Amino acid sequence: GWESGIVPGSRDVATEPVSAAKIGADQVKMLAEMIGYEGQIAILSAAATMDNQNTWIAYMKEELKKPEYAKMELVAVVYGDDVREKSYNEALGLFKAYPALRGIISPTSVGLAATAKAVTDQGKIGQVEVTGLGLPSELAAYVENDACKAFGLWNPIDLGYLNAYATYRLANRQINGKPGVCGKDRDVQSL
């Protein structure tokens, strides 16, 4: 994805929208609350080759090992390749393969909107809960009809500011690799 880091040896600085561990854990927590901490769940991701997606999924799997999720079972991880139609069809495949499915996490805005549409079209609102990372502009109708009760995303304005700030500081040789505070007085993990 566009928010994935490039190979460490090929960059001078990298910023994350939010910690990968938090993204993974928060998505599991959101879904767990929706399904009462029990039932079959699946992940509908972007492409199997996307480092950010794989990292978030690894953290989701770690979160699911905690005792509070003992009654939740991850039954599948599928990939829609960040293509709306393929993601939609993958969601339909999950409904068919796992009739007792209670929830789907989709850590990709394309996949989340497609999954919410599939839940809506198949009359599964309230039966299969959906969460993940998405854009309010793409999910408004699905929030209103309860197909997607909650989702997350980092603040792109803050991320843009941080990237501009880091680029400016890098160009002026003001980055030393030590933790610091960015221009809006927010803690930055490595400037």
Predicted regions and their residues:
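Structural recognition of the beta-strand scaffold that forms the well-ordered cores
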Residues: 1-3, 17, 40-45, 76-77, ...
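Flexible loop/hinge segments that line or gate small-molecule binding clefts
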Residues: 1-22, 33, 40, 136-144, ...
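Short beta-strand elements in bilobed, periplasmic/extracellular small-molecule ligand-binding domains
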Residues: 12, 40-43, 64-84
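Short, solvent-exposed amphipathic alpha-helices that sit
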Residues: 23-27, 51-71, 86, 90, ...
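Short, hydrophobic alpha-helical segments
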Residues: 31-39, 95, 163-175
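Hinge/cleft segment of the Venus flytrap/periplasmic-binding protein
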Residues: 48-52, 62-65, 162-191
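Hydrophobic alpha-helical
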Residues: 60, 76-142
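Extracellular/periplasmic ligand-binding modules, especially the Venus flytrap/periplasmic-binding
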Residues: 107-116, 144, 154-176
